Amino acid sequence: MVRSNKQEPRVSSTYIRSLVKQQLAYSTTMTTTTTTTTNDGSGGGKTQTQTHKKQVRRRLHTSRPYQERLLNMAEARREIVTALKQHRASMRQATRIPPPQPPPPPQPLNLFSPPPPPPPPDPFSWTNPSLNFLLPNQPLGLNLNFQDFNDFIQTSSTTSSSSSSSTSSSSSSIFPTNPHIYSSPSPPPTFTTATSDSAPQLPSSSNGENNVVTSAWWSELMLKTVEPEIKPETEEVIVVEDDVFPKFSDVMEFPSWLNQTEEELFHPYNLTDHYSSSPHNPPLSCMEIGEIEGMDGDDWLA
């Protein structure tokens, strides 16, 4: 046999790897053809062929985690649906039934003390209604005649009967004998019978006209019924004033020369007679103007 000098090219390892990858990629069959020729120098090459073997692909268990994931997602969806249903049901009940109002907090006992009693009225204040003293329009002057002042109180008490109606509570305790004088004005029994018997029928008209007519009719009726009773009421007031408030002349005893009139008081003879009658007050000597001008300072003081 004659050996050929030519040698076959060697197969690189990268080429073999690429072929292996291609064979593994297919799923139907896998075929491998390898030829190896190893000859030293002058030797010929031999080819070795491998038989095609059908390899069975083993099925990997990759579906179990996917199925488990699907089951987990389904359970999560069911939980979400049930939670939404419960939430919607609770919202509907809240809209239908209003929430109950909380009870008010209990108030502590004895927290607020009662208001203090009003202070007693000041007896020295001019606003006190019980101090209803009337002063005369004219001053007393040098006459100091308290008898005229007492007469003024008796005459002016009739005019102040209307103002004393506001102090009915205090005056009723002071004057229990005549409560109708100092109480609020009320129509007498004769006035009530007259109004019930002789009240005319007022014409039916508007409210304004009715008010005018009724006021005029009441004023006329009051004038007719109250005027005859003014005099006895004034007499009763004077009697009560004399009983409760005694005259100043009875309480305070003044000398006779203070109760005299102005003409008698300031008469020169009356003054000299009065002062001469008392031993402690001798009458003063009268001096002429010429004598006063002629006197010196030392003589005047002596």
UniProtKB/Swiss-Prot annotation:
One CC-aspect GO term: nucleus
Region called Disordered, residue ranges: 32-65, 86-125, 155-210
Originating species: Arabidopsis thaliana
Role description: Required to regulate responses to abiotic stress (drought) and to oxidative stress leading to cell death. Confers sensitivity to paraquat (PQ), to the catalase inhibitor aminotriazole (AT), and to the fungal Alternaria alternata f.sp. lycopersici toxin (AAL toxin).
Keyword Nucleus: yes
Induction: Induced by oxidative and abiotic stresses such as hydrogen peroxide H(2)O(2), cadmium chlorure CdCl(2), and osmotic stress induced by mannitol or salt. Seems not activated by heat and cold.
Bias (Low complexity) ranges: 155-173, 191-200
Bilayer-spanning residue ranges: none
Keywords: Nucleus, Stress response
Record gene name: ATR7
Start-end of Polar residues biased regions: 201-210
Protein's GO biological process: regulation of response to oxidative stress; response to cadmium ion; response to hydrogen peroxide; response to mannitol; response to molecule of fungal origin; response to osmotic stress; response to oxidative stress; response to paraquat
Biased composition (Basic residues): 51-62
Gene deletion effect: High tolerance to several reactive oxygen species (ROS)-inducing agents such as paraquat (PQ), aminotriazole (AT), and the fungal Alternaria alternata f.sp. lycopersici toxin (AAL toxin); these phenotypes are probably due to higher basal levels of ROS and constant transcription of abiotic- and oxidative stress-related genes. Reduced sensitivity to drought stress.
Protein name (database record): Protein AAL-toxin resistant 7
UniProt-annotated location(s): Nucleus
Main location: nucleus
